[in-house]
Amino acid sequence: MSNTIFPGNTLGIIGINRNGVAMIAAAKKAGFNVGVYVDHSQPEITKMADFTIDGAYNDKQKLTEFGEACDAIIYQTPNIDSTVIRFLGQYAAIPQGINGLEIVQDRLMERAFLDQININIAPYVTVIGLDDVYQSIDSIGYPALLKPIQRGIGEQSMMIKRQSNITRAADFIDTGTYLLESWIDHTAEYTLTAACANGEVEIFPLAQLEYNEDRQLISVASPAEVADDMLQEMHRIIKSVADSLQYTGVFSVNFYVTSTGTLYVKNIELGLTSIANVYDNTTNVDQYEQQLRASVGMPLHVIRQLQTALLMIIRNYQAVAIRRQWLLKNNWKFRFFNNKDKDDPAGILGFVWVTGDTDLNALQNQVDDTEVWNKTLPNSESDNEEQEK
């Protein structure tokens, strides 16, 4: 099927989350009809779509109805089983392809892929039970992360800091194969996001991430500053991934940097991310328009940096404190969500883009002075996007 579609045609979106509102808006602005497939009602996200089909991901009748109503279908996140996307491919074009999705959904395949293109990753072994963990931990070292091979909604990793922790893995390990991976002690985390289509690769400016101890995202800073040779290596890596993954659209590569300056690739993420929302107010084109252009056969925009920004994550428990900044800050831009998880104190309420200075340290000082983000975040069970990948 042709991956070229034109205004007036129908673009389907599956695997939607809070970023879906912006993706639907981008497609509608460009003149496309938009259909959405969800496995549970999300009217706060899908109300802008021309039609919504609510059905299980194994409901072939509903999937067929959706596929036949669309000219092309994209997955917004990689949390949709590749067999579902392959089934939909009988009825509509799948511009992003399936190969990349199958690779990133399987941690072992992803690491084999990264090894094949000579990219530095953490040491790992595969395990299927406690005996394997005991036998392998000496070669991996402490601390280590135990992760299911298959990525998916709701799955988590387990940190093993000492031998006494291994017994707890009996409750964690179910059936199937797991990955035991060295935890890389790092001083910084970065994300590089790119769009690729028809041999073109356009790379967004580097972003630096800040997490709390519970791996909840606090802020995204862009453009992040690193040594020129490290930035060149990051660009080489993301271009190598783009050239080899057989994927069309927006994707990200996440990095660790150690205290000695060693660069490790953490993982590959396909589709749209909350992290890349920083570009909504820092570059001439955002991730949503680039995803749309790649998906419908248009050439990619050449990306240009326009300004420096901090993207701050607003949690529900910060709702009262952020209201004062809403009234005071003329250089802050806000986006709030109609939250279904508003009863979770650590659920994401919205984003703030802090701009107005070319110095990220000055922007951070401005944020620190408000004391909105100085409190310890409550534990959250609702936000799978932030879990260790």
Q: Where in this protein do the model-derived segments appear?
A:
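ATP-binding N-terminal substructure of ATP-dependent carboxylate-amine bond-forming enzymes
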Residues: 1-105
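Peripheral (often C-terminal) accessory segments that flank ATP-dependent C-N-forming ligase machineries
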Residues: 6-7, 293-389
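Active-site nucleotide/adenylate-binding loops and adjacent lid/helix of ATP-dependent enzymes
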Residues: 105-190, 195-244, 365-367
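Short glycine-enriched loop/turn motifs at secondary-structure junctions
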Residues: 47, 118-120, 150-154, 306, ...
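Phosphate-binding core of ATP-grasp and ATP-grasp-like enzymes
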Residues: 173-225, 232-264, 269-276, 293-302, ...
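A conserved FAD-binding loop/helix module that cradles the flavin
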Residues: 279-281
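Structural detector of well-ordered beta-strand residues that form the stable sheet scaffold
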Residues: 35, 74, 94-96, 122, ...
